[in-house]
Amino acid sequence: MCLMVTLVEHPLVQHKLSLMRDERTGVKEFRELAGELSLLLAYEAMRDLEVEPVRFATPIEEGDFPMLSGKKLALVAILRAGLVMTDAIVTLVPAAKVGHIGMYRDPQSLAPVAYYSKLPADIAERRVFLTDPMLATGGSANAAIQNLKDAGAQSIKLMTILAAPEGIHAVQQAHPDVDIVTASVDSRLNDHGYIVPGLGDAGDRIYGTK
């Protein structure tokens, strides 16, 4: 199976992303924009959810109407920045279970290491939407995806606000069965591993830290 990258180019998505890129955008507005953009990305990421007809009565007449069916959902945030995405998306799918994966970079090998993982016990039975605003080198995403697979997850989709070509390639090589939904594929990574033109450090801008 080949990885598919869905680029969401809706005018509202691109407008909100441009506001996030602007260095003049403050913490409150940046956080709100990240949540709003996550909802718009979720609309596209969940386009293929299964529905089935359910019979009930409206105030006018009885009929068969489409309702979600198939696998239940799980939203999993890569800490810390992914939280702003899952917090927004869960308002769309309140029955979804929410998990968290914390990552740090080993100072010697520079490899990402999971320091925290709390996932739904029935993760194998759920469609998983993994959230992280930035897909830069792909190291954290790949480690988180492997963590999910080790826990039994079989259906995983990565949702990210920005992606670099290097990160997409890394995920494609390691996990060709995981699709990506993003608002933009930027030009490259700089020497410090930041996405260019990017929007800076998403976590710092969401939480007002440095």
From Swiss-Prot:
- Which EC number(s) does the record attach to this protein? 2.4.2.9
Summary of activators and inhibitors of this protein: Allosterically activated by GTP.
One Gene Ontology CC term in the entry:
cytoplasm
Question: Which pathway does the UniProt entry assign to this protein?
Answer: Pyrimidine metabolism; UMP biosynthesis via salvage pathway; UMP from uracil: step 1/1
The cross-references to Pfam families, in alphabetical order and at most eight, read: UPRTase
**InterPro entries, A to Z:** PRibTrfase_dom (IPR000836), PRTase-like (IPR029057), Upp_B (IPR034332), UPRTase/APRTase (IPR050054), Ura_phspho_trans (IPR005765)
Instruction: Explain how, and how many, cofactor molecules are bound.
Output: Binds 1 Mg(2+) ion per subunit. The magnesium is bound as Mg-PRPP.
Give GO BP annotations, semicolon-separated. UMP salvage; uracil salvage
| Gene3D superfamilies per UniProt | 3.40.50.2020
* Molecular function terms, GO-annotated: GTP binding; magnesium ion binding; uracil phosphoribosyltransferase activity
Nucleotide-binding is among the record's keywords = yes
Q: Kind of enzyme, top EC level? A: transferase
List the cofactors.
Answer: Mg(2+)
Q: Where does 5-phospho-alpha-D-ribose 1-diphosphate bind?
A: 80, 105, 132-140, 201
Key words of the record: Allosteric enzyme, Glycosyltransferase, GTP-binding, Magnesium, Nucleotide-binding, Transferase
Which residues are uracil-binding?
A: 195, 200-202
| Identification of the protein by name | Uracil phosphoribosyltransferase
